[in-house]
Design a protein with these regions (language model features):
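Conserved, well-structured beta-alpha core segment at the onset of a catalytic domain
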Residues: 1-11, 357-360, 364
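Aromatic-lined carbohydrate-binding surfaces of glycoside hydrolases
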Residues: 4-251, 278, 310-337, 379, ...
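Generic recognition of stable, solvent-exposed alpha-helical segments in well-folded globular domains
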Residues: 25, 92, 96, 147, ...
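Active-site clefts of carbohydrate-active enzymes
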Residues: 119-120, 170-177, 262-293, 308-310
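Noncatalytic carbohydrate-binding groove/subsite architecture in carbohydrate-active enzymes
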Residues: 224-239, 247-271, 277-279, 292-296, ...
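P-loop NTPase catalytic cores that bind/hydrolyze ATP
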Residues: 298-307, 377-381
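C-terminal non-catalytic alpha-helical accessory regions
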Residues: 310-546, 571-572
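A eukaryotic intrinsically disordered, low-complexity regulatory tract that is acidic and Ser/Pro-rich
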Residues: 539-577
Length: 577
């Protein structure tokens, strides 16, 4: 039987990339679970090991970092003293990682976002700054990128390749987020810019006999289409890596529409295990069946690789390895080999590897796997009904909005679902029907959570007492988080409902519910504050933030002062006033 995906990678995205013990843990998981690649994802990872030497006085014939350093150390010390020695230390570290991975048949890839560079180049190349804005169209950048990747593969010849995202504003400079108004930028189209940048990367990578993958990580449908146009002009050996959902890792979104639409190029599809937008594992959100379906469609679209991200660049010191969401990584590894593997088998493998069972017997695996499925199988439903509303993203990377305007900016602008599913354009409009649906979602989600949590009172034989105690603690924390999120989103949607004209009966009922919702927010903020005296991982207190809840309440109270004026205006529906 053939494997689901030929290429199965674990991706590290946080500063754990530079933590040897964490990288070894990832390599151990890859080996144990039959994966075959490690992706080290830091936006500046190439710039952390390459100066490049050419711009500091290195000779053309220099072929490694020490030869280059011998001709550049004085200039480096003058212009960038803190960066003088760091690159050759990090180069040795990464060479060791690549060598260790090769021993077990695992490829190592870099992933980044371009353009990225050290600020010293703005001093060395003053033409790059024009009227206070950085210019992405200056020819220097394309020369710089080509030199950077030439030196990279001289330093790390064992590196399998590079995955890059040229279409996001999260790089230091991109045509996508360009604020320069010079003549060069006026003439430069996104398609031309992407083509020139990708070409500058591809030439040295291909010359080294290695591979380049380009991501379609973009923030809008228009940007995705502009980048897709550049794909058509890329050399045939460049592949495309696509998030499984468009824009970002939102499990409520449809499949990324570019999957299967990249011509004959190799394709990878990317998944997030930790849960940047679905609770960080502080609220477990296990996505086994969602992923099984998405992977099946990806296989039908001739996708050959799958990537599973374990952490996030903006949340250092946290990882899927620290939470129940590690189940997602096991799911990715196992489904990536065989889409028919049963859900209970994935849970059992997670429990065995986490040493949660008294003994690794077929009987205990079966009993504990089935129990874990009943405990966690609907966990995504509970998160979906609190952090989302009618499938729209009402969370700021799993944190609660800080105010009224912030919430709708997140849901309808920054993370717009309507951009990818036009039927959702009015999903959050302040109507009675939408309000009822959103409030019901909160109630049903919390009920799902409580039914699942009841399994903790009926543990299976073979489960260690310590494992059960840990799960009980996790669920107590999750309960607080979901209750806080449900209260916050109830208050937000009631505030929006009251912010426009409504019939008198609906307004009176809405006002009563809004007042209760604000009281709930206050009570939960007090509970969160008391909980601060406990001792858990820092990310727990980031999500259970009393200060954040109180900020939201204060904003909504200020907003409520305008409700009386709104109530005096005629209702669009012509209702009673």
């Amino acid at each position: 039987m053939s494997e689901t995906f030929r290429f199965r990678a674990l991706e590290m995205h946080s500063r754990f990339v530079w933590d040897y013990d964490r990288v070894r843990r990832s390599l151990d998981f890859i080996h144990a679970q039959g994966m075959n690649a490690l992706i080290l994802h830091r936006n500046d990872i190439v710039d952390r090991i390459v100066w490049p030497g050419r711009y500091f006085g290195a000779r053309e014939e220099d072929r490694n970092i020490f030869e280059r350093y011998g001709h550049t150390f004085r200039t480096l010390y003058r212009y960038t003293p803190t960066r003088r020695s760091g690159p050759y230390h990090r180069r040795e570290y990464l060479r060791r990682i690549v060598e260790l991975a090769a021993r077990q048949g695992v490829e190592v890839w870099f992933q980044n976002k371009e353009l990225f560079f050290h600020e010293v180049f703005l001093e060395l190349q003053p033409q790059l700054t024009k009227d206070g804005a950085l210019c992405p169209s200056e020819p220097f950048w394309f020369e710089f990128v080509e030199q950077k990747y030439t030196e990279l593969f001289q330093e790390l010849p064992g590196l399998a390749g590079v995955v890059t995202a040229p279409g996001t504003g999260e790089s230091r400079l991109s045509i996508t987020a360009n604020r320069c108004r010079c003549a060069l930028c006026a003439q430069m189209t996104p398609r031309e810019w992407y083509s020139r940048l990708i070409g500058a990367m591809h030439r040295p990578i291909a010359a080294a006999g290695r591979s380049l993958m380009v991501r379609d990580f973009v923030f809008s449908k228009q940007a995705q289409e502009e980048l897709a146009a550049a794909f058509k002009e890329m050399p045939a050996d460049i592949g495309v890596s696509l998030k499984n959902t468009p824009h970002d890792y939102y499990p409520s979104f449809p499949d990324n529409p570019r999957i299967g639409r990249v011509g004959a190029r190799r394709q990878w599809v990317e998944f997030d295990c930790m849960g940047q937008y679905f609770g960080w594992g502080i609220a477990p959100a296990v996505l086994i069946e969602d992923w099984r379906a998405r992977m099946g469609r990806a296989v039908a679209a001739e996708v050959e690789g799958a990537v599973f991200r374990t952490d996030w660049e903006s949340l250092d010191s946290h990882s899927a390895f620290e939470t129940v969401n590690l189940v997602n990584l096991h799911a990715g590894a196992m489904l990536g080999r065989d889409l028919s593997v049963p859900e209970t088998g994935i849970y059992a493998e997670w429990m065995v590897r986490q040493e949660m069972l008294e003994a690794d017997t077929p009987e205990d695996r079966a009993a504990c796997g089935a129990w874990a499925e009943r405990l966690l199988g609907r966990s995504w439903e509970a998160v979906r009904g609190t952090l989302y509303a009618r499938d729209c993203v009402v969370n700021d990377s799993s944190t609660i909005p800080v105010g009224f305007a912030h919430a709708w900016w997140l849901a309808e602008e920054k993370n717009s679902l309507a951009d990818w599913d036009p039927s959702k354009v009015d999903a959050l409009a302040p109507t009675e029907e939408n309000l009822r649906a959103v409030l019901l979602e909160r109630d049903e989600a919390l009920a799902v959570f409580e039914r699942s949590a009841s399994m903790l009172d009926r543990p299976p034989p073979g489960l260690k007492d310590a494992a059960l105690a840990r799960l009980r603690t996790d669920f107590e924390i999750c309960r607080r988080y979901l209750q806080g999120y449900a209260a916050a989103t109830r208050a937000l949607f009631l505030a929006r409902f009251l912010s426009v004209p409504q019939g008198s009966a609906a307004r009176a009922e809405g006002q009563e519910k809004f007042d209760r919702a604000l009281d709930d927010v206050s009570a939960l903020a007090d509970e969160f504050e008391r909980f601060e005296s406990t001792d858990h991982r820092p990310v727990v207190y980031t999500l259970l933030s009393a200060e954040r809840l109180r900020c939201l309440r204060a904003d909504l109270e200020e907003r409520a002062a305008t409700f009386m004026d709104v109530s005096l205006r005629p209702s669009a529906a012509g209702g009673e006033h």
